[in-house]
Design a protein with these regions (language model features):
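Thiol-based oxidoreductase modules, predominantly thioredoxin-like and allied folds used
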Residues: 18, 41-56
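Stable alpha-helical elements in mature extracytoplasmic
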Residues: 4, 29-32, 88, 92-95
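Structural micro-motif
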Residues: 62-72
């Protein structure tokens, strides 16, 4: 999972996961994201923001993120959906390939 938020709006859909190591569900969600990435490949940007990372405060403030949030962006970089973990790989694939 990539940490380069500059990829949002690069013409590909993006999903950003707010990973918090203090939440057990974060590891489960990361596993499901990796499963989805194996199926979808490079046609979607799978990105991660670590909760508590001060270098990402602007992003977290702009989108009012919380730990375990999943933010879905279209290819133009517009936020189109937000969910809270846990989403299974199948659900992620469905959301990202429609």
């Amino acid at each position: 999972i990539d940490t380069d938020l500059e990829k949002i709006g690069n013409g590909q859909k993006s999903v950003v996961f707010v990973y918090d190591p203090n939440f057990a569900i974060s590891n489960q969600q990361a596993t499901e994201i990796n499963k989805a990435r194996e199926v979808i490949g490079e046609q979607v940007n799978f990105l991660i923001v670590r909760a508590g990372d001060p270098t990402r405060d602007d992003f977290k403030e702009q989108y009012q993120t919380r730990s375990a949030d999943l933010l879905f962006f279209n290819g133009d970089g517009e936020l189109i959906d937000r969910q809270i973990a846990l989403l299974g790989a199948e659900e992620l694939i469905e959301k990202l390939t429609d």
